[in-house]
């Protein structure tokens, strides 16, 4: 049961402040904003709004170009830095994404969203030590947030630090006991540790929480193949 926590988190953090639209409506909106931006070339707001729509259409290069325009005039614009880094990630230009996240942290130290994104990006780049250091920093600075523990747990699990990962998933659950994803990650970790009985108990808990058994079928199979 594979999950892409990097993409899921980044998509969740994007606030476009627009209603759900069809692709045609989005393209029409972009055309309108492009004309307005041509008429008001100094308007940062118009360029950021257009770039946000470009991201929704997965037009990474167009979005990046708009953020470049903003950052040429305002090098420390937090929105442009964060979402240009996101666009760079989608374009697989990881070093450039990393540089933008790091610059943003210089200007907004300890920013939660940026720490999460940078920790996960480093893990994606196989910079495991740096990823774990950032995850530790994330937990130390945001120990009230369940996602901080879940991010660190994911990094620990990938490195085979299963007992630490299990502890962190339990911490995440203690801070947000309605998030079924955290329970599922915990189950996967228990299976990795060959603690099948405990994994089955957690699966039973998930079904009681309303998760359809069909969605958990693969995990049940893994427990039974012990």
Regions found by a protein language model. Name each.
Residues 44-45, 78-79, 112-113, 146-147, ...:
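Helix-start (N-cap) detector for alpha-helical repeat units in TPR-like alpha-solenoids
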Residues 39, 73-74, 107-108, 141, ...:
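Structural marker of alpha-solenoid helical repeat scaffolds
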Residues 24-28, 188, 192-226:
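Terminal, low-structured helical/coil segments at or just beyond the last alpha-helical repeat
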Residues 56, 90-91, 124-125, 158-159, ...:
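Register position in tetratricopeptide repeats
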Residues 17-61, 65:
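N-terminal leader/linker segments that initiate helical-solenoid repeat arrays
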């Amino acid at each position: 049961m594979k999950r892409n926590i990097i993409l899921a988190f980044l998509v969740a953090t994007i606030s476009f402040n627009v209603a759900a639209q069809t692709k045609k409506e989005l393209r029409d909106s972009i055309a309108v904003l492009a004309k307005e931006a041509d008429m008001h070339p100094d308007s940062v707001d118009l360029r950021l709004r257009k770039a946000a729509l470009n991201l929704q259409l997965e037009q990474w290069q167009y979005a990046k170009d708009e953020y470049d325009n903003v950052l040429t005039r305002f090098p420390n614009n937090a929105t442009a830095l964060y979402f240009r880094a996101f666009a760079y990630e989608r374009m697989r230009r990881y070093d450039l994404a990393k540089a933008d996240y790091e610059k943003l942290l210089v200007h907004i130290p300890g920013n939660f969203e940026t720490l999460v994104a940078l920790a996960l990006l480093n893990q994606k780049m196989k910079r495991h030590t740096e990823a774990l250091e950032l995850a530790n920093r994330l937990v130390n600075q945001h120990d009230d947030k369940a996602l901080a523990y879940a991010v660190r747990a994911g990094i620990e699990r990938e490195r085979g630090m299963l007992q630490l990962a299990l502890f962190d998933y339990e911490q995440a659950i203690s801070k947000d006991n309605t998030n079924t994803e955290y329970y599922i990650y915990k189950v996967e970790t228990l299976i990795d540790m060959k603690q099948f009985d405990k994994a089955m108990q957690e699966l039973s808990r998930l079904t009681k929480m309303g998760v359809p058994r069909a969605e958990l079928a693969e995990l049940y199979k893994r427990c039974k193949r012990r």
